[in-house]
Amino acid sequence: MGGNLISLDHMIDFPNHSRSYDPTRPAVRFWGHDSAIEASFFINEDALKRIQPDARPDESGFLNAFDSNRDLICAAAAKVYVRGSRGSYDLVAANF
């Protein structure tokens, strides 16, 4: 896979590289697509720290950690995704 599009057995793709930091959760939000359905995912700060222990503990640092580990994060998101489910999905340190 080229890294631009991740598609696994769960039929969800992550073609959109948009992501944002949500200080109310605190987590990085990103989106996946299953046909015409959009699913929201959040990866919390503890999970990002587990993946990249040297990440700066601020918005920029967490976004950079997400960008540097996008393929790993999207693979974990695909594992928790349930087709036809509504709502959002949370990735935590235990997912890594």
Model-derived segments and spans:
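A broad, structure-centric signal for solvent-exposed, well-ordered loop/edge residues
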Residues: 18-21, 37, 50, 55-58, ...
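Short, charged/polar N-terminal "headpieces" of proteins
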Residues: 2-32
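A generic signature of intrinsically disordered, low-complexity regions enriched in glycine/proline
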Residues: 17, 26, 38, 71-75, ...
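Acidic, low-complexity intrinsically disordered segments
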Residues: 2-8, 54-96
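Flexible, active-site-adjacent loop/turn segments at secondary-structure boundaries
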Residues: 12, 19, 39, 46-49, ...
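A short, structured beta-strand/loop element
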Residues: 27-54
